[in-house]
């Protein structure tokens, strides 16, 4: 039975490495299978056409506060009994029910009924609905590129002042930038996921006397020590069916952001900075010295044929490699063997260290953004609520969800991996980079990059030839 990535999987907006909503893991996104959001370009959920058209969320109908509900957190919102706000999303069950539960008190205290409709055809249907004047009041958009295209229609509303205030207070500038189009802020961040983690076994580290590295130099020194001890320091797997190659795109993204920061990273995403640019080439060379180092990984070419699921499955027992760079969802794969996931257990993760002191807390990940197609008072009230620390905390407390909202206390997280991810995602000093290959044209981010990076590992193709081929594949218009 294929692994299903619980709801927070890494790559959102496309179909690639992880799933997108429906089951969750520890990544803040929502997907239902690891080949779905690198996530969304890579693998659609298996549903019938009829089911695709009827994937509608459950509806909360509570419209009046009861004695059991504490309405103090919602005192700033006006009573709007009888009003309904619709939300369209790619998030599916069971996450939809959990979201409704998280919003129940808000609905009870304000009288606003929130109706959420989820569809695995979201990205195809939303533009059609907007063009046909049948847009929802709100939409959770997992792709900044899709947001930009919708803004071009003139139908997306600029975020109201209350939302702007919340985002300025609770999110880093990097996060706000992804909800901004041509200088105007439209969409507040919603859920999030993190990919900048390294999986390892606390028990195996303790037995061998190893310490978790906190700098890149410490990590490479540790890898040398492991190699000297006869161990395989790092492992990796690019295999993912029709999406084979995506893990290598993640490795390059991690290093480009760490080496050069947001300006170069975003220029690379837009192709104003080419793959053949010396800065991108230098980062790829660093990836090669890390993940193509025979002393650390053993059989380099074998990485191209190993599946991403199998790459680190033996980490808990110390029989395979000692470390694997993967997103937070990977804990669910390891846990399938019965391994305990905790800071002192069979497996856990640490933050992939920075490479450049001038780039503070670099984090690669993804997430959704709340865009509005109506400016009715009740819609703006829901917008403000969804961008608040009150909502984010309510959802986090129900488990298996990550928010980059810094107003959420870390104590609210039940899942230790989610808490670890939130520590970095919600850091106000973080330099956040939305998964680059998910933002690039599909012909590149879910096409030539996968193919060329697989050839880079599996065939020993040179960086010069790889970058030349990817640049040549970039759409002309």
PLM regions with names:
Residues 76, 128-129, 136-137, 167-203, ...:
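A structural signal for short loop-to-beta-strand junctions that line the ligand-binding cleft
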Residues 76-79, 160-171, 238-242, 258-282, ...:
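Short, solvent-exposed loop/beta-turn-alpha elements that line the ligand-binding surface or hinge
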Residues 150-154, 175-214, 238-268, 364-371, ...:
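Periplasmic solute-binding protein
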Residues 326, 335-401:
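Extracytoplasmic/periplasmic substrate-recognition and gating elements
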Residues 269-302:
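Glycine-centered hinge/linker elements that transmit conformational signals in sensory
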Residues 69-79, 144-196, 247, 349:
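Hinge/lid segment of periplasmic solute-binding proteins
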Residues 101-173, 203-214, 313-315, 322-323, ...:
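Extracytoplasmic "Venus flytrap"/periplasmic binding protein-like
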């Amino acid at each position: 039975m294929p692994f299903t990535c619980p709801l927070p999987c890494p790559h959102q907006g496309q179909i690639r490495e992880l799933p997108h909503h429906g089951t969750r893991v520890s990544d803040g996104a929502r997907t239902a299978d690891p080949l779905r959001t690198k996530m969304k370009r890579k693998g659609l959920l298996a549903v019938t056409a009829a089911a695709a058209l009827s994937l509608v969320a459950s509806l909360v109908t509570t419209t009046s506060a009861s004695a059991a509900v504490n309405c103090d957190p919602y005192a700033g919102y006006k009573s709007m009994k009888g009003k309904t706000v619709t939300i369209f999303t790619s998030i599916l069950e069971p996450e939809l029910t959990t979201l409704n539960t998280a919003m129940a008190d808000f609905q009870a205290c304000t009288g606003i009924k929130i109706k959420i409709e989820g569809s695995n055809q979201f990205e195809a249907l939303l533009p059609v609905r907007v063009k046909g004047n049948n847009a929802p009041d709100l939409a959770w958009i997992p792709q900044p590129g899709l947001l930009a295209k919708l803004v071009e229609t003139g139908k997306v509303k600029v975020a109201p002042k209350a939302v702007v205030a919340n985002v300025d207070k609770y999110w880093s500038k990097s996060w706000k930038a992804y909800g901004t189009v041509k200088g105007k802020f439209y969409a507040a961040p919603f859920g999030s996921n993190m990919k900048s983690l390294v999986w390892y076994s606390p028990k195996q580290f303790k037995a061998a006397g190893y310490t978790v590295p906190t700098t890149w130099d410490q990590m490479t020194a540790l890898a040398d020590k492991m190699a000297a001890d006869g161990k395989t320091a790092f492992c990796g797997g690019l295999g993912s069916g029709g999406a084979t190659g995506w893990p290598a795109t993640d490795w390059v993204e991690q290093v480009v952001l760490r080496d050069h920061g947001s300006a170069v990273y975003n220029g690379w995403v837009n192709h104003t900075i080419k793959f053949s640019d010396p800065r991108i080439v230098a980062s790829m060379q660093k990836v090669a010295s890390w993940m193509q180092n025979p002393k650390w990984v053993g059989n380099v070419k074998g990485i191209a044929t190993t599946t991403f699921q199998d790459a680190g499955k033996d980490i808990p027992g110390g029989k395979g490699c000692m470390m694997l760079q993967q997103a937070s969802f990977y804990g669910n794969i390891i846990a399938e063997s019965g391994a305990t996931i905790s800071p002192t257990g069979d497996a856990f993760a640490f933050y992939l260290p920075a490479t450049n002191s001038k780039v503070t807390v670099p984090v690669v990940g993804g997430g959704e953004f709340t865009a509005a197609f109506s400016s009715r008072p009740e819609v703006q009230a829901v917008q403000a609520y969804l961008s608040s620390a009150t909502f984010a905390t309510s959802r986090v407390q129900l488990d298996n969800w990550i928010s980059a909202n810094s107003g959420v206390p870390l104590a609210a997280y039940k899942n230790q991996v989610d808490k670890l991810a939130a520590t970095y995602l919600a850091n106000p000093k973080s330099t956040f980079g939305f998964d680059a290959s998910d933002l690039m044209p599909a012909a590149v981010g879910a096409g030539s990059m996968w193919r060329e990076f697989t050839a880079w590992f599996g065939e020993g193709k040179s960086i010069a030839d790889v970058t030349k081929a990817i640049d040549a594949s970039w759409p002309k218009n």
